[in-house]
UniProtKB/Swiss-Prot annotation:
BP GO annotations: dopamine catabolic process; norepinephrine biosynthetic process; octopamine biosynthetic process
Family membership: Belongs to the copper type II ascorbate-dependent monooxygenase family.
Annotated DOMON domain residues: 103-214
Knocked-out gene: effects: Worms are viable and healthy, but have slightly reduced locomotion rates, and defects in the inhibition of pharyngeal pumping and egg laying in the absence of food.
Keywords carried by this UniProt record: Copper, Disulfide bond, Glycoprotein, Membrane, Metal-binding, Monooxygenase, Neurotransmitter biosynthesis, Oxidoreductase, Transmembrane, Transmembrane helix
Protein name: Tyramine beta-hydroxylase
Function in brief: Required for the conversion of tyramine to octopamine, a precursor of octapamine but probably itself a neurotransmitter. Involved in the regulation of egg laying, which is inhibited by tyramine. Due to its involvement in octopamine biosynthesis, also required for crtc-1-dependent regulation of AMPK-mediated longevity.
InterPro entries associated with the record: Cu2_ascorb_mOase-like_C (IPR014784), Cu2_ascorb_mOase_CS-1 (IPR020611), Cu2_ascorb_mOase_N (IPR000323), Cu2_ascorb_mOase_N_sf (IPR036939), Cu2_monoox_C (IPR024548), DBH-like (IPR000945), DOH_DOMON (IPR045266), DOMON_domain (IPR005018)
Native species: Caenorhabditis elegans
This enzyme's EC code(s): 1.14.17.-
CC per GO annotation: extracellular space; secretory granule membrane; synapse
Length: 657
């Protein structure tokens, strides 16, 4: 019987220790060495140095050196490979359920990273279709996509694709292998990457599944044919390097005294029949948080059934002051004045996400001496079809314990400031914008650093690629989280295993890449669904006072550019009007402006939990949080790949051709 993922990891880690002991090799804990990455074993990054007398690997923020003779070193590496083969590799599993009118079709997968294979088991449910279509794509396109076809009468599969005209065509190279066929399900296998130009390459990030079925018609050749019953789903066939499972795959067990608290709207008022509404709900927690501290160990969205298409995202804030309970528009002038103290964000959720699990060593603190018991939920309703009379009582569900865990957990916002300064020109295929959390802000983190255990990337409709990278001493040392094919319709909290260690003085860069080819006007940075955002909510411990670390291109840079290059009134015009008054972004204008965004000074939000900025310290008196130079980066020998979005070069200008 094949071992489970957690068993395989236990065997591997135990085997590493056994091999080192057997060969009498010694381990030293040292700082990172600049050595080329050779291969990766779970959370062990193994390095082969220029000297043949040592083998190095790193785990977390530390590096280790195995000292020994060359012969023993070769034996150790060989045994490590054998051990990985024995353990069956690291396996990632996932599942989606497609609702197809007659039945629910369930697609499960097991991804074997070591063997570079993925097995799909497809369960037909109550009514097996005559023909099943399973498509894979980055962004949900139904043409130019990879397809697996299954014909029930013949019990046959076919590796196919849809061409630009949506026609289903058999692939010249058949890369799917039928492993099992039963009355109620089939199992197929494929390599993650086949090097076939008609096949989908499974990569870290979101994969969009297009599932279609037909009963009675077996000769359908166009995926747009109305006889198909269709559904779209989202999943991750491959997890990123910090998403690997560890020994503790299950969420931490809840304490016995856990209380369940629901904070939601009990107002009978319907959702307004306008496109964008932000509703605020202020509630008092139903237990004594003035004299006692509690830990939130789990949070779940509480979305009114049937309203999933209207509730776009939610945030919940702690209030510093005692505030009267209230429910209504966040922009209502009758909103309690003291609600301004509700600024400490403790959780965020977006459509498509599940619960937030805290690790066993940490919990989100609520209450304590001198603390108030009030929280505010902010709900963003997206109602483009202007539905009327929809009653909603969505909110958050908390799992709270009085048995305090070792660490207080915190949440921090990274990315771009919500501002029209961060706007995107029209007709751009891959317009990258970077939000910086520089060393001047992260120096306020605890001396021992923080451990990021979860990450939630968020953008709106034109976002296509989102990621946050970590830099130390100007050198990129890895990613916190990355989604190569982001979808605003399936957002999820990514648990990070192992945790990502961030030290004071590190720089975090959050990058969002937008596609505005279908838009004829500028897409402004802002709160509406048609505007754009770029955010990464990171969940971490131990808690710090840093809550917001975001940036924008400085207003002074923008005003100087639009004044000098486009003859606009740089002093009195609104930033949004300046963007709108550029009549033609072609003929090199977009390329020139892209360069301005990447070299101009920036405006920083480095904010405490009370909304106040940290004191700015710089030897350069000309700089401030409102006008500071962006970080500089250098190449390091252990990660030599330049990220073309975070560190642009002339090599990348093909994007503008």
């Amino acid at each position: 019987m094949e071992p489970t993922a957690s068993q395989g990891i236990q065997y591997l880690r135990g085997g590493v220790e056994w091999i080192l002991k057997l060969l009498n090799l010694h381990i030293l804990n040292v700082k990172h060495e600049n050595k080329p990455l050779l291969f990766r074993l779970i959370d062990l990054k193994v390095y082969i140095p220029s000297s043949v007398s040592t083998v190095r690997w790193s785990s977390g923020a530390s590096s280790y050196v195995i000292l020994g003779e060359y012969r023993k070193m070769r034996s150790a590496v060989a045994l490590l490979f054998l051990l990985v083969a024995y353990c069956g590799g690291v396996v990632h599993a996932g599942e989606i359920v497609a609702e197809l009118y007659h039945t629910n079709v369930t697609v499960k997968w097991h991804t074997d990273y070591e063997r570079q294979l993925v097995d799909f088991s497809i369960w037909f449910g109550a009514s097996t279709p005559d023909v099943l279509f399973l498509g894979f794509s980055d962004f949900g396109d139904t043409n130019n996509s990879d397809v697996l076809m299954y014909y029930n009468s013949k019990k046959e599969i076919k590796d196919a694709y849809t061409n630009r005209d949506f026609k289903i065509t058999s692939d010249l190279q058949q890369d799917f292998q039928l492993l099992r066929k039963r009355k109620d399900h089939i199992v197929v296998r494929r390599k993650l990457t086949t090097c076939d130009s008609r096949d989908y390459a499974f990569l870290p990030g979101t994969t969009q599944f297009y599932i279609a079925a037909s009963w009675g018609s077996t000769n359908l050749v166009d995926i747009r044919d109305k006889r198909w019953v269709v559904d779209k789903k989202f999943g991750k066939v491959i997890e990123g390097p910090t998403d690997q499972p560890n020994i503790e795959e299950e969420p931490a067990a809840l304490e016995k005294d856990v209380k369940v608290v629901i904070v939601n709207s009990n107002s009978p008022d319907p959702i307004p029949n306008v496109e964008t509404t932000y509703k605020c709900i202020i509630r008092k927690m139903p237990f004594d948080t003035v004299n006692n501290m509690y830990h939130v160990v789990r949070m779940e969205p509480y979305v009114t059934p049937g309203n999933e298409h209207l509730v776009h995202h939610m945030e919940i804030f702690m209030c510093r002051d005692e505030v009267e309970e209230w429910s209504g528009s966040c922009n209502d002038p009758k909103k309690p004045p003291k609600s301004k103290s509700c600024s400490h964000v403790i959780a965020a959720w977006a459509m498509g996400e599940g619960p937030i699990h805290y690790p066993k060593e940490a919990g989100l603190p609520i209450g304590g001496k001198g603390k108030n018991a009030y929280v505010m939920v902010e709900i963003h309703y997206n109602n483009p079809e202007l539905h009327k009379g929809v009653i909603d009582s969505s909110g958050f569900q908390f799992f709270v314990t009085g048995q305090l865990r070792k660490y207080d957990a915190g949440i921090m916002e990274l990315g771009l400031i919500y501002s029209d300064a961060n706007s995107v020109p029209p007709n751009q295929k891959a317009w990258a914008m970077n939000g910086y959390c520089p060393s001047q802000c992260t120096k306020n983190l605890p001396e021992e650093g923080i451990n990021i255990f979860a990450s939630q990337l968020h953008a709106h409709l034109t976002g296509r690629k989102l990621f946050t990278s970590q830099y130390r001493s100007g050198v990129r040392i890895g990613d916190v989280n990355r989604d190569e094919h982001y979808s605003p319709h399936w957002q999820h909290l990514q648990q990070l295993r192992p945790v990502v260690k961030v030290m004071p003085g590190d720089t975090l860069v959050t990058t969002c890449v937008y596609d505005t080819r279908k838009r004829s006007k500028v897409t402004f940075g802002g709160y509406r669904i048609v505007d754009e955002m770029c955010v990464n909510y990171i969940y971490y411990y131990p808690a710090s006072d840093v809550e917001v670390c975001k940036s924008a291109i400085s207003n002074s840079t923008l005003r100087a550019y639009f004044s000098e290059r486009h003859g606009m009134d740089g002093k009195r015009m609104q930033i949004s009007d300046m963007y709108s008054n550029v009549k033609d972004w072609g003929n090199g204008v977009d390329e020139e402006f892209y360069n301005v965004l990447n070299v101009g000074n920036m405006n920083m939000n480095c904010l405490k939990s009370n909304g106040e900025p940290f004191e700015f310290e710089s030897k350069d008196s000309r700089q401030s949080w409102e006008n500071m130079a962006r970080p500089t980066f250098v190449s390091g020998s252990f990660i030599t790949t330049r990220d073309r979005f975070q560190c642009p070069a002339i090599n990348d200008m093909i994007n503008f051709e």
